[in-house]
Amino acid sequence: MLDEESSIQRRDVLSALGAAGVTTLAGCTGGDTGDTDDTEASETTASEGTTSGTTTGDVETTDGGGPSEGETVNAAWVYISEIGDLGWSWAHDQARQAVDEQYDWLETEYTEAVAPSDSERVFEQYAQGDVDVIFGTTFGYQDPMYAVAEDYPDTVFEHATGYRTRENMGRYMGRIYEPRYLAGQATGMVTENNTIGYVAAFPIPEVVRSINAMALGARSVNPEATFKVRWVNAWFDPPTAREAANALIDEGCDVIAQEQDSPAAVRAASDAGVWTSGYNAPMGQFGGENYLISPIWDWTEFYGPTLESLHEGSWEADAFWGGMETGVPMLDEWGPNVSQEVKDQVAATEEQILNDELDVWAGSAFEGESDEFLFQEMSSFVEGVEGEVPS
């Protein structure tokens, strides 16, 4: 259950991340850069799901749209991929199911496998119905949602990973670079070759942030650790991700990390008998004996307070970019063969992060940079990562 204190803490507003000047952001987790994911998502027919709660009282509507205070809240989620892929969309839908079960005044539904090019139609259909809030969970939905939000001021819109807002449209993301740093420490402690491979999606600030954070974490415990990066140029392409992982292993990497919406790279590492760290969702079942740990999401800690504010009539558009203290970005469970020494090191560092005693970027070229820069401008690697970020 989400208590009042936690709800307030988890609604961390980043006023420094205004929409102005953020137009260079190319894409974000689970989304696309241009039309990259359109083809893939379009190959699967969009499907819908619905679950129901119960109805309670009513009062008045907030300025930003949404239901009257105390009324049933009808919420819809739109996903870029199928929710069974154990990745980005899966993590969001796990949270949808959790809040649906928790609140008897909430009714939820979803549409999966929606290409960005088709998302405006889906958003409009929901807005024309009885939906009070629509969550668009991929970067490529940003402009379509922004357009639809203007035409439906009484509907609340929330967009994941983007930078545009309206009076009735908020945005949200988590500082996944914090658990990435911790997972990086684990990789730095288990590598014997001092060479760690990273299967990356797109060369965009969000992915570069994650690579850099993991490298900084690894080198904080092992200054000799280096990272090799292979770009897949897709969020979900299991065959290519597996090929990239195998290529990195052939180059001498004895630990494989990934930023993909499938466990393909984790599977490849497990098959090759090397350590591995996943992303988005717990992937221990695929890493087996060689599994380390993964940075994952618990979006319940965002969706819960957001829906509560809608139910209470207090919702306002904001820019959520919470860290591990919010419970949104986190680590999953350790693999079966991770040493206590590694666990203790990561636990101690996690405590420092949670107590605001450690800044991931301290001592790097990005120390002291603004949240705006970290969110949308980071475009180069830290020391220890081979090569350059493609332009």
Curated annotation (Swiss-Prot):
Coiled coil: none
Pfam families, A to Z: Bmp
Sequence segments annotated as region (Disordered): 24-71
NADP in keyword set: no
First and last residue of the signal peptide: 1-28
Origin: domain of life: Archaea
Gene Ontology terms: cellular component: plasma membrane
InterPro entries: ABC-Purine-Binding, PnrA-like
Protein keywords: Plasmid, Signal
Low complexity: bias regions: 42-59
Function of the molecule: Part of an ABC transporter complex involved in glucose import.
Similarity comment: Belongs to the BMP lipoprotein family.
Complex and partners: The complex is composed of two ATP-binding proteins (TsgD13), two transmembrane proteins (TsgB13 and TsgC13) and a solute-binding protein (TsgA13).
Protein name, as recorded: Putative ABC transporter glucose-binding protein TsgA13
Organism: Haloferax volcanii (strain ATCC 29605 / DSM 3757 / JCM 8879 / NBRC 14742 / NCIMB 2012 / VKM B-1768 / DS2)
Gene this protein is translated from: tsgA13
